[in-house]
Amino acid sequence: MTQVARAKQGVVTEQMAAVAKSEGLSPEAVRDGVAAGRIVIPGNVNRRFAPVGIGSGLRTKVNANIGTSPEHHDVAEEERKLQTAVAAGAHSVMDLSTGGDLFAVRKMVLEKSPVMVGAVPIYEVAARLSAESRAFYEMTPDMLFDAIERQCAEGLDYITVHCGVTRQAAALAGADRRVTGIVSRGGSLLAAWMHDHRKENPLYEEFDRLLGIAAAYDVTLSLGDGLRPGAVADASDGAQLQELVVLGDLARRARDADVQVMIEGPGHVPIDQIGANVQMQKALCGGAPFYVLGPLTTDCAPGYDHITGAIGGAVAAAAGADFLCYVTPSEHLCLPDIDDVRVGVIAARIAAHSGDIAKKVPGALDRDMQMSACRKALDWRGMYQAAIDPCLPRQRREASHPEEESVCTMCGELCAVKTHNRMTNP
């Protein structure tokens, strides 16, 4: 029986109780959120790890994408990325591998990860066909659903499935309508398959089949935004909104089937449109948790997209987004390395925390109050402990060699805090 089914029966599961304790909420509040579809607790029946909740009233969570590519595939390197992401504070990792031994990478991640694990099953289908020198055109619905069921059986806690890329919605993302067209890998593959076969998306057409698989393993469905805008000029257009309408209907069907579901969101979005996008998703999707990539607030900052993503992520979280997918400095440029992973997680955590303060999530200000008290006391060790990233501030201060231990090299003897402390505590 799934978490949703138990919640609807009034049962507080072990996972719900654990989430309630970590969030400082009552178990009943978490149970009611799960029953209503406003909270998900991803966790495959075949995996055991500390459960984490995503959704309304909870702290904003952060995901880190790792995984190979056709041009770069090293299982050991992906393991180091996994370790780096978790050490930096990621609540989730997604294996987005598309090259090399995909099974070996996924097996390693599922065995080694102490946090929830997600993936995009259609990538495996595409990679296998490519390895056999076959076009994605040759994919059959059975091949796709077989991959989904196999990966769920292996232990994935949630899967991204681009069910909302219908023929009607994909047509609205044509080259004559958008600057960048379709920028989602899964979305573009399905759009091309539908175009070539003149058939509907099997994930949409056979959604009940997908629900059956997800329910069997209590896998959370992350309904992918295959038509997300890849340019700020494309944001909030017909294709994006049509897909969101479809996802709202599918989310309702998932809840009716006692399957946990969350919705993925844009993308590249001007900062003034982010709040409206979040509100629209919540309204159309019945309050389902919103999982956003960024959003990136400008297109012209390659190499710094962890910053554009953090800006958008903070605004989205403040408006009600629940789950931030990190963006790294390598976005749009290359496969992320270990340093990119660490920087991306920290940037997303800063965005999530900033959003939580704005949302007035219980306890969100505690860390800031701790940091401020330590700054007032010139307690440098305490400042390091209160920092989202304790390592970098310690490194920077120790490398600067201040003449006086109580101050830093920015102000030295002119330290405002020291001056005020001397005035108020003579």
Curated annotation (Swiss-Prot):
List residues binding substrate. Answer: N65, M94, Y123, H162, S184, R185, G186, D225, G226, L227, R228, E264, Y291
Catalytic reaction annotation:
5-amino-1-(5-phospho-beta-D-ribosyl)imidazole + S-adenosyl-L-methionine = 4-amino-2-methyl-5-(phosphooxymethyl)pyrimidine + CO + 5'-deoxyadenosine + formate + L-methionine + 3 H(+)
Annotated EC: 4.1.99.17
Where does the record locate the signal sequence feature? none
Please list the residues that bind Zn(2+).
H268, H332
Please tell me whether the keyword Metal-binding is annotated for this protein: yes
Q: Which cofactor does it need?
A: [4Fe-4S] cluster
Task: Name its pathway.
Answer: Cofactor biosynthesis; thiamine diphosphate biosynthesis
Q: Note whether Lyase occurs among the keywords.
A: yes
Q: GO molecular function terms here?
A: 4 iron, 4 sulfur cluster binding; carbon-carbon lyase activity; zinc ion binding
Q: Which InterPro entries match?
A: ThiC, ThiC/Bza_core_dom, ThiC/BzaA/B
One matching Pfam family is: ThiC_Rad_SAM
Single GO biological process annotation from the record: thiamine biosynthetic process
On cofactor binding, the record's note says: Binds 1 [4Fe-4S] cluster per subunit. The cluster is coordinated with 3 cysteines and an exchangeable S-adenosyl-L-methionine.
Residues annotated as binding [4Fe-4S] cluster are C408, C411, C415
Assigned keywords, A-Z? 4Fe-4S, Iron, Iron-sulfur, Lyase, Metal-binding, S-adenosyl-L-methionine, Thiamine biosynthesis, Zinc
What family does this belong to? Belongs to the ThiC family.
Q: What does this protein do?
A: Catalyzes the synthesis of the hydroxymethylpyrimidine phosphate (HMP-P) moiety of thiamine from aminoimidazole ribotide (AIR) in a radical S-adenosyl-L-methionine (SAM)-dependent reaction.
Subunit arrangement?
Homodimer.
In Swiss-Prot or TrEMBL terms, this protein is called Phosphomethylpyrimidine synthase
Q: Which organism is it from?
A: Desulfosudis oleivorans (strain DSM 6200 / JCM 39069 / Hxd3)
